[in-house]
Amino acid sequence: MTDRLLNGPPVVSPQEWETACQQLLVKEKASTRARDALAAERRRMPWMRVEKSYTFDCPKGKVSLLDLFEGRRQLVIYRAFFEPGVFGWPEHACRGCSMMADQVAHVSHLHARDTTFANVSRAPQPDIERLKARMGWTMPWYTITDGFDADFGVDEWHGTNVFFRDGDNVCRTYFLNSRGDEALGSTWSYLDITPLGRQETWEDSPEGYPQSEPYKWWNWHDSYGVEQDGKWSDVVDAAQAIPA
């Protein structure tokens, strides 16, 4: 009895394995550069003004789409299917949507880049709060009360919409669904689909977009907003001085 894959790849020496890794790394770096270029193109997409008003339920009552930003400029909304008719209701949300919820990065890192994340569903708030408590989810999760899902392409299938707020004006800036959602979950993946991106100096962004040095804005998720002593910046500088 063996655990080896039937007709699997050959088992080679450490030297041969390293050579194969380096050969693949060339293609992986090309893929990363292509992904960065695509994100830069995404940041230059035209926007669509949101003309209608939308209302959601939350634990504290009724809120508007503008309220969902929580004062930040960018908003990422994932449409999770949790409602009557969904497999698992009322104990569970859609299995795929639940996996997505399990993968969401700690939202404090997104907040540090002026970005809010939220889930929306058709389920009433008591059911959502009960589900969140049992599954250990902490992201904001609102109840759709009107035509928001139909208007933004998420009435019959999951999807992620991105919005930007300029004062009280809201624009839709990006949308993806189906397998496009597979890559989401990390802080970077969400920032890369926003109009401002990661807001780091290496990015190709339109002139005037906010940017700061990479790594230096990073923090523990419970320490954003706390005055820093500059030691982390020194660590970053020292690390970047080491030849790659």
Segments predicted by a language model, with ranges:
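Non-globular targeting/processing and membrane-anchoring segments
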Residues: M1-R113, R130-G136, P140, D146-A244
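Short internal beta-strands
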Residues: T116-R122
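Short beta-alpha junction loops
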Residues: R122-Q125, G147
